[in-house]
Amino acid sequence: MNSSIVEKTAAYFRGKGVILPTIAELKNPNLISEEIKNKVLTLDKDAMDPANLFRVHWFNQRDHSNFLDVPEHIVLPSEFTGVDAKIIVNLGRYFPLITAHKVLAAYGCLLPRILNGSFDYSKHKAVWPSTGNYCRGGVAISKILGLKSIAILPEGMSQERFNWLEKWVEDKNDIIKTKGTESNVKEIYDACNELEKNKNNDIINQFNEYYNYATHRAITGSSFEKSFLKVKGNTNLQARFYVSASGSSGTLAAGDYLKENLNTKIAVVEAIECPTLLYNGYGEHNIQGIGDKHVPLIHNVMNSDFVVGVSDEATNNLNLLFNTNEG
């Protein structure tokens, strides 16, 4: 631990009115003090205010007027899925700042660096490699803490991601566009290797950050358990599968928690157009946000039970189904 940097950062944060939420508070927002809670709930969920860090969890009410005891979720009806099993979908859209749960991973990866003094706000830049939402989360967290940051993502990602980033970064040069689309993770790594030559760049790489794994195992896992227990009620319903896309394997870590506590199996989803785990294959696809073409260091592969290939044609058709009058 670098105590002098920790003390300097603490003074800097005090001057900016920054209070960092604990992992325990994000796992259970009932632990957040009433004073902080009352302040947070008066803010716009996307405001560049450090108090919004206390919304970086699964328990935000849909209108963001309160915190919940159970995460927002939906149960897909059998008429839609064609199967009898209840399929519970936990909703990440109610996270603050970026309307996606990747902001949680970004905070979980940055927090230890702040606490141990390895990140010096006066000279370091946080570099956020991503296929889209993780770098948005990292830029958002950095911005409200007063830290410098760089976003790296493929040039072929959605325009909405780039529009958002341009509003949040200090300088448009802090958005680095690499070649390719969703599957081109190697090109992101190549850019990181170049940036890492400057020792003031701290590469916070979600694909090999064990804090990404630990954050989701602790927070997302227990949050999803509450969703299941709510749906189960007083019935004999059993949790059979936890299903998550491969991506950085952060969200997959919740499966390890659920397997340990609910005895679930873990199913890993990847695009059939880029069947890395299924066939050691590669290719291009348009399921934005799940990455591909490599197995992340933090993926607990031997604890995964099934790999599920999904075509981007299927996901594109679902977008049409739910977003057109004909659908």
What are these regions (language model features)?
Residues 124-125, 136-193, 276-289, 295:
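Active-site-proximal loop->helix
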Residues 103-125, 135, 220-234:
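Short internal alpha-helix immediately C-terminal to a glycine-rich phosphate-binding loop
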Residues 2-122:
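Positively charged, low-complexity intrinsically disordered leader regions
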Residues 195-249, 253-254, 258, 316-327:
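Active-site/ligand-binding-proximal alpha/beta "capping" segment
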Residues 71-88, 104, 112-115, 194-198, ...:
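Acidic-glycine-rich active-site phosphate/pyrophosphate-binding loop
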Residues 186-200, 259-327:
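Active-site/ligand-binding loops adjacent to catalytic centers
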Residues 117-156, 235-253:
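A short, small-residue-rich loop immediately preceding and capping a beta-strand
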